[in-house]
Swiss-Prot record:
InterPro entries: 4-alpha-glucanotransf_C, Alpha_amylase, Glyco_hydro_13_cat_dom, Glyco_hydro_b, Glycoside_hydrolase_SF, O16G_dom_2. This is 4-alpha-glucanotransferase. Belongs to the glycosyl hydrolase 13 family. It comes from Thermotoga maritima (strain ATCC 43589 / DSM 3109 / JCM 10099 / NBRC 100826 / MSB8). The gene is mgtA. The lineage of its organism: Bacteria, Thermotogati, Thermotogota, Thermotogae, Thermotogales. Keywords: Calcium, Carbohydrate metabolism, Cytoplasm, Glycosyltransferase, Metal-binding, Transferase.
Length: 441
């Protein structure tokens, strides 16, 4: 199984307004099929006021610029006709500030007030987020404070209220009925106060649902493992970082430790990736990777057990340095051709890094057998031919600082994988490993 994360606004335009949309995605199915994609993860598509879409104001309507419900269903049908499943990003930890529920709560409606989390006399109003020290409690003009872990425009939902749980369960069932195949649950570790409570929450929430359920649990291994047994798929932030760090330092140690910690022996599928919307792109890691190091990172990604997930444009070497508050710089328009003046091209903003005639386009790289796209296509074909690797076991055969060798195997298959992280040729067991290359035998 191979996944592909898409920021809809930047991917493909279907109505010539420069904004990516459902019609554009429908028109892009052939490219994704050629790339070997089995499921697409669409970043939030619901009505919201932000560019990123994680502050939903109506879960039952789509962003107007993305298209209608009819176009959404037609898009899903086109994906399904090509054997590609659709996974939606679903941020149900909170709503947007302008959501009808929160607006009614602000006006004093007791029913909807209990949909959110409010401070009381015992609340520490100076409580701060663990990752950046920002305040969690936000004031209103009347002196009340509400909880918004992800900022004042994203008030937290109150899951102590069973009606909130039921509302979100109805939403999930509604979307599944529309043909959606699964969800990436945003901020999944923050639904309840403790690991144990959070695990119970998700176990109950998902108990009667079937689909692809990805969890964003950016945390230590124990929390990831506890949730993985429920979700079945876990975004592997640990190995994502360590692939890049190992390639950057030309040293295998952090990668070996991460594979042992986050890949081997799991009773769920790690979803491995090299970048996403919350970090700098692969090509821009630590100031920028060479073409050889980008390709090596992709090779490692596609030769690990679990599910490889590609962030749109990483198959082209798109650049982007994540920096607050302008995080949209990692969400540049996807370049379909060199001039970026072609039907389907999005242009909702000027590219911060990946402008016209940069060599970063589908058109240009399809003509070049040595391109990052051609390299990625080779690995996606490899995974399609070896789908057993998703659940393969991994045994290290050699752990040198500059190169590593491991065996992937199950009851019927076996392959040896050789990664050379150095700039010099290496020979091991008769296999020549060129600089920054991967060999599979």
């Amino acid at each position: 199984m191979i996944g592909y994360q898409i920021y809809v606004r930047s991917f493909r335009d279907g109505n010539l307004d420069g904004v990516g949309d459902f019609r554009g995605l429908k028109n892009a199915v052939s490219y994704l099929k050629e790339l070997g994609i089995d499921f697409v993860w669409l970043m939030p598509v619901f009505s919201s006021i932000s560019f990123h879409g994680y502050d939903v104001v109506d879960f039952y309507s789509f962003k107007a610029e993305y298209g209608s419900e009819r176009e959404f269903k037609e898009m899903i049908e086109a994906f399904h006709d090509s054997g590609i499943k659709v996974v939606l990003d679903l941020p149900i930890h909170h709503t947007g500030f302008l959501h009808t529920w929160f607006q009614k709560a602000l006006k004093g409606d007791p029913h909807y007030r209990d949909y959110y989390v409010w401070a009381n006399k015992e609340t520490d109003l100076d409580e701060r987020r663990e990752w950046d020290g920002e305040k969690i409690w936000h004031p209103l003009e009347d002196g009340r404070f509400y909880r918004g872990l992800f900022g004042p425009f994203s008030p937290d939902l109150n899951y102590d209220n069973p009606q909130v749980f039921d509302e979100m369960k109805r939403l999930v069932l509604h979307l599944l009925d529309m043909g959606v195949d699964g969800f990436r649950f945003d901020a999944a570790k923050h639904m309840r106060d403790t690991i144990e409570q959070n695990v119970r929450f998700w176990k109950y929430f998902l108990s009667d649902l079937k689909g692809i359920f990805l969890a964003e649990i950016w945390a230590e291994a124990r929390m990831v493992d506890e949730h993985g047994r429920i979700f079945g798929y876990m975004l592997n932030f640990d190995t994502s970082h360590c692939i890049k760090e190992a390639v950057w330092k030309e040293n295998t140690r952090v990668l070996i430790e991460s594979i042992e910690r986050a890949v081997i022996g799991k009773d769920y599928l790690p979803v491995n990736f090299t970048s996403n919307h919350d970090m700098s792109r692969l090509a821009s890691f630590e100031g920028g990777f060479s073409k050889e190091k980008i390709k090596l990172s992709i090779s490692i990604l596609f030769t690990l057990p679990g599910v490889p997930l590609v962030f749109y444009g990483d198959e082209l070497g798109m650049k982007g340095v994540y920096q607050k508050p302008n995080t949209e710089v990692v969400l540049d328009p996807f370049p379909w051709n060199e001039s970026m003046c072609v039907e389907g091209q999005t242009f909702w903003k000027w590219p911060a890094y990946n402008g016209p005639f940069s060599g970063i386009s589908v058109e240009y790289q399809k003509r070049d057998p040595d391109s990052i796209l051609s390299h990625t296509l080779g690995w996606t074909r490899f995974r399609k031919e070896n789908q057993w690797i998703d659940r393969a076991k991994l045994e290290f055969l050699c752990k040198e600082d500059k190169f590593l060798v491991y065996r992937l195997y199950d009851d019927q298959h076996s392959l040896k994988v050789f990664h050379n992280l150095s700039g010099e040729e290496v020979v091991f067991e008769g296999v020549k490993m060129k600089p920054y290359k991967t060999e599979v035998v």
